[in-house]
């Protein structure tokens, strides 16, 4: 998921972001729209909110492999992923501040460095099982006392 903020009105920027997410994921991204207008956030119902892609099966595993082995190590001052991103339903969410850490992105064509949110939805129904699964997939978590914080 990539939120566009004030750039959501510029069709060229939206198209560039769709191309970037498509390159990163290997699957066509879709535009997300606001469901209702909120004046405090200056949003209008039906306006572009961002871009998302949902990966399953082989494409998901290929993405996780590139994320863990290539993209995350390229993040400047990266110490590991926080374990605070787990919810009570066995899902894990985290953000990346720069989408250019993925090798598929041509740095010369990027108009602006953007962040993205990544959510991993699992069939596990608790934090511990999901944590064990992601550790088995070599996700680099911060090495504080993880076992205490998972309870």
Task: Describe each PLM feature range.
Residues 1-151:
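Ribosome-associated RNA-binding proteins
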């Amino acid at each position: 998921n990539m939120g566009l903020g004030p750039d959501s009105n510029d069709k060229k920027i939206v198209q560039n972001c769709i191309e970037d997410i498509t390159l990163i994921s290997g699957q066509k991204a879709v535009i997300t729209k606001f469901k209702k207008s909120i004046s405090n956030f200056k949003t209008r119902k039906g306006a572009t909110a961002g871009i998302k892609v949902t990966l399953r099966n082989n494409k998901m595993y290929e993405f996780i492999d590139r994320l863990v082995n290539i993209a995350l190590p390229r993040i400047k001052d990266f110490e590991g992923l926080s374990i605070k991103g787990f919810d009570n339903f066995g899902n894990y969410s985290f953000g990346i501040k720069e989408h250019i850490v993925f090798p598929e992105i041509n740095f010369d064509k990027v108009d602006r460095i953007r962040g993205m949110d990544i959510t991993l939805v699992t069939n596990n129904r608790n934090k511990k099982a999901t944590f064990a699964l992601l550790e088995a997939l070599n996700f680099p978590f911060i090495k504080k006392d993880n076992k205490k914080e998972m309870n």
